[in-house]
Amino acid sequence: ALPRPVLAIDEWWPVNEWQDIGGRQLKVLHAPGHTRDSMILYDAERAQLFTGDFIYPGPLFAYLPGSDLDDYRNTTIELLDLINSESILLTAHRSKAPGAPLLRRHDLEDLLLTLKEIKSGTRKGKGVFPVTYKVNDEIDLLTDISW
């Protein structure tokens, strides 16, 4: 068997600070919801968000230890306040080839509407555990039994 690689962390990037990565400025955003410690990188110059597991085409897991729908909603509101209609969300978990999975502002708007309707009880999900809520044609939100 091959030895496991060791990845050393030299520095933790502080939240809400800009990091220069080879002449490109990225702001580190705390993005709880999927997990308590989720983060997103924001490139204001290119109007891009690197969202990781916070939002992507496919099933969003919001039933993990540390997942929180209130946090998901609040982070989604903050992201919508930050970006414009031209912004691109570069996400994780490519389900369709080729290229990086991309979403747009309207996908965050759809997620926010879904979260609000789950909270108010007007959006009905399918299943018991996880409960699946249709966000749009590309995204489902999977939650535990209660908000």
Regions found by a protein language model. Name each.
Residues 4-81:
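Catalytic core of the metallo-beta-lactamase
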Residues 77-147:
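Accessory terminal helices/loops
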